[in-house]
């Protein structure tokens, strides 16, 4: 295999595997938030605010994977 092919394959795997965890995490966060709002509708604002903050933290991992993939493609 050529070096370019290996570089693109590594970048694709880095992004793909780096997005699996955040995707599962966001799904679990959404599920938990909906259950909590269903049990206590009065606390909707607080739950929603905390959920948005935690989703941002979870998605930051996917953004790091994207940056690593871009570095693998253009720098390595």
Swiss-Prot record:
<keyword id="KW-1003">Cell membrane</keyword>
<dbReference type="GO" id="GO:0045259">
    <property type="term" value="C:proton-transporting ATP synthase complex"/>
</dbReference>
<dbReference type="GO" id="GO:0033177">
    <property type="term" value="C:proton-transporting two-sector ATPase complex, proton-transporting domain"/>
</dbReference>
<comment type="function">
    <text>F(1)F(0) ATP synthase produces ATP from ADP in the presence of a proton or sodium gradient. F-type ATPases consist of two structural domains, F(1) containing the extramembraneous catalytic core and F(0) containing the membrane proton channel, linked together by a central stalk and a peripheral stalk. During catalysis, ATP synthesis in the catalytic domain of F(1) is coupled via a rotary mechanism of the central stalk subunits to proton translocation.</text>
</comment>
<feature type="site" description="Reversibly protonated during proton transport">
    <location>
        <position position="59"/>
    </location>
</feature>
<dbReference type="InterPro" id="IPR005953">
    <property type="entry name" value="ATP_synth_csu_bac/chlpt"/>
</dbReference>
<dbReference type="InterPro" id="IPR038662">
    <property type="entry name" value="ATP_synth_F0_csu_sf"/>
</dbReference>
<comment type="similarity">
    <text>Belongs to the ATPase C chain family.</text>
</comment>
<dbReference type="InterPro" id="IPR020537">
    <property type="entry name" value="ATP_synth_F0_csu_DDCD_BS"/>
</dbReference>
<dbReference type="GO" id="GO:0005886">
    <property type="term" value="C:plasma membrane"/>
</dbReference>
<keyword id="KW-0446">Lipid-binding</keyword>
<keyword id="KW-0813">Transport</keyword>
<comment type="function">
    <text>Key component of the F(0) channel; it plays a direct role in translocation across the membrane. A homomeric c-ring of between 10-14 subunits forms the central stalk rotor element with the F(1) delta and epsilon subunits.</text>
</comment>
<protein>
    <recommendedName>
        <fullName>ATP synthase subunit c</fullName>
    </recommendedName>
</protein>
<keyword id="KW-0138">CF(0)</keyword>
<keyword id="KW-0812">Transmembrane</keyword>
<dbReference type="InterPro" id="IPR002379">
    <property type="entry name" value="ATPase_proteolipid_c-like_dom"/>
</dbReference>
<keyword id="KW-0406">Ion transport</keyword>
<dbReference type="InterPro" id="IPR035921">
    <property type="entry name" value="F/V-ATP_Csub_sf"/>
</dbReference>
<dbReference type="GO" id="GO:0046933">
    <property type="term" value="F:proton-transporting ATP synthase activity, rotational mechanism"/>
</dbReference>
<keyword id="KW-0066">ATP synthesis</keyword>
<dbReference type="GO" id="GO:0008289">
    <property type="term" value="F:lipid binding"/>
</dbReference>
<keyword id="KW-0375">Hydrogen ion transport</keyword>
<dbReference type="Pfam" id="PF00137">
    <property type="entry name" value="ATP-synt_C"/>
</dbReference>
<keyword id="KW-1133">Transmembrane helix</keyword>
<keyword id="KW-0472">Membrane</keyword>
<dbReference type="InterPro" id="IPR000454">
    <property type="entry name" value="ATP_synth_F0_csu"/>
</dbReference>
<feature type="transmembrane region" description="Helical">
    <location>
        <begin position="55"/>
        <end position="75"/>
    </location>
</feature>
<feature type="transmembrane region" description="Helical">
    <location>
        <begin position="8"/>
        <end position="28"/>
    </location>
</feature>
<comment type="subunit">
    <text>F-type ATPases have 2 components, F(1) - the catalytic core - and F(0) - the membrane proton channel. F(1) has five subunits: alpha(3), beta(3), gamma(1), delta(1), epsilon(1). F(0) has three main subunits: a(1), b(2) and c(10-14). The alpha and beta chains form an alternating ring which encloses part of the gamma chain. F(1) is attached to F(0) by a central stalk formed by the gamma and epsilon chains, while a peripheral stalk is formed by the delta and b chains.</text>
</comment>
